[in-house]
Amino acid sequence: MTANELRKMYVDYFKERGHQEIASASLLPENDPTVLFTTAGMHPLVPYLLGENHPKGTRLVSVQKCVRTGDIDEVGDDTHLTFFEMLGNWSLGEYFKEESISISYDFLTTCLNIPKEKLAVTVFEGDELVPRDEEVSQTWKSKGLQDNQIFYYGREENWWGPAGQTGPCGTDTEIFYDMGKPSCGVNCGPACDCGKYVEIWNNVFMQYHKKPDGSYEEMKQKNVDTGMGFERVLTILNGYTNVYETELFLPVKNRLDEIIEANEAKLSEKSKRIICEHIRAVTFLLGDPKMIVPSNSEQGYILRRLIRRMIRHLKQVSIENNVLCKLSKVIVEQYGSIYVELRENELFIMEQLEKEYDLFSKTLDRGLKNAKLYFDQVGEEKILNGELSFKLYDTFGFPIEFTIELASEMEITVDVEAYNQKFAEHQKKSRQGAEVKFKGGLSDHGEQTTRLHTATHLLNGALRTVLGTDVFQRGSNITEERLRFDFSFHRKLTKEELEEVERIVNEAIRNQIDVLCEEMTVKEAKELGAVGIFEDKYGEVVKVYMIPGYSKEICGGPHVKNTSELKSFRTVKEEASSAGVRRIKAVIGSN
């Protein structure tokens, strides 16, 4: 069975049973600070699982792009992936356990022709608060599963939620495929890691609401949330032992082999797998509609880590030229008809890969040489201290996970706690230095710097008007002569865009607008629509400076009383500051 056939078969099957298809959401979850990426098909549906009405009804189906980063170091084995697709179906208050299991069982045995003897399932065994899930157990038995195919586990294996201290939660039943390997012992089952059982589908039943006192009550609207591992099922259906044998990885693996052969190099099978897996994940992250860029924090940090890991494996065998773009093009070609954003953002993907390669390759060789010197210094205890591991980060840009991976190849342990202490000291010094040099981004509070400070607010507002509201300030510096403003954006501004930014700022100056200031809570400021990336330093009550029609920002000040005091505004230079960050230098008219 091909990948496209499996996707289509799944969606069509559920459509025939009254489900409406919903498109894959972004890899960046909407309004969920608890996770970096969309890790399951349920992420975009959380409000509806909590009771809101979905515009497409109560039965839904999707193929969702997902990224999970907890097992990056495991990538290269037979099963672990950072990027994957999840097939999912949902019932929002309609069908429940019996119908959900019946639908799942029918799809597996009738559509995919998996013999029921190859299935194993897990069921919640019950505890002092919630009884054993007999309904699930009896439903599976009614399908012909024998007692030795049904395994009972506690909350660690067969319970979902709540996300916080209280809220929706419930039991689940996981469906496994028996790979035919011999049992590892008398207690062998789906919960062990011997490889006999591979999980392919999970049905979560949101039945209870956990109350503040720790007790549970039945929910009025009971929901079903299911997720099937697309890559795993495709591997099993085609009789392969690992996901890298499937058509999902063969095109990029073949291209990588061509490059290796052309360079007369030799690369281990694990390194090949890491590169093929990571280039797929990186291509989807860079190609996401929200355009993630490599950086040193949050999603950008994970992206940078994946890219640098690939570069390191390629450099190991002296493949010097940047082949990442060649590999990424294979992914775009392969998936572009299904996920059109990859083709739409192909140029951006290639630009970012080139930039990150150029940025890292300059220091990688020196860094690897120094890492070897540091490893030679560890002595018999085979522990790399915090000072040396921090030097690799501070001087050569090696993420700590990167250093750990290098060290493990030489059977050396990294003192991560000592590294974290050094890193914290570095951050503290950096913050103190910044406060001494430019308090609030200003070199002083003189008349000229105050005028330029107000100009940065107008510039920020104009950039968001011209380029979009996903543009955010990334830093600023003001002297007597000019302002310097850094902002998140992925490419050079066109001449027309810069001219429009200038026009908007000068329009605000000509309109002679009073600059208003109000004190309010951070919550009130956000509800007002104020922007600001430095809220944490201002406390609970903040000042919001407003230039009506042009700007609302949380800020410590100071500012001019009227925009006319700026006289005029002109950009002097627009350039790259770092990956995904642009910089504008500008001046204003003299008094």
Curated annotation (Swiss-Prot):
EC number in record: 6.1.1.7
Required cofactor names: Zn(2+)
GO molecular function terms listed in the Swiss-Prot or TrEMBL record: alanine-tRNA ligase activity; aminoacyl-tRNA deacylase activity; ATP binding; catalytic activity, acting on a protein; transferase activity; tRNA binding; zinc ion binding
The keyword Chaperone appears for this protein: no
Subcellular location: Cytoplasm
Cofactor note: Binds 1 zinc ion per subunit.
InterPro entries assigned: aa-tRNA-synth_II/BPL/LPL, Ala-tRNA-lgiase_IIc, Ala-tRNA-ligase_IIc_anticod-bd, Ala-tRNA-synth_IIc_core, Ala-tRNA-synth_IIc_N, Ala-tRNA_ligase, Ala_tRNA_ligase_euk/bac, Thr/Ala-tRNA-synth_IIc_edit
Pfam families from the UniProt entry: tRNA-synt_2c, tRNA_SAD
Keywords for the protein's UniProt record, in alphabetical order: Aminoacyl-tRNA synthetase, ATP-binding, Cytoplasm, Ligase, Metal-binding, Nucleotide-binding, Protein biosynthesis, RNA-binding, tRNA-binding, Zinc
Role: Catalyzes the attachment of alanine to tRNA(Ala) in a two-step reaction: alanine is first activated by ATP to form Ala-AMP and then transferred to the acceptor end of tRNA(Ala). Also edits incorrectly charged Ser-tRNA(Ala) and Gly-tRNA(Ala) via its editing domain.
Protein known as: Alanine--tRNA ligase 2
Species assigned in the record: Lachnoclostridium phytofermentans (strain ATCC 700394 / DSM 18823 / ISDg)
Gene of this entry: alaS2
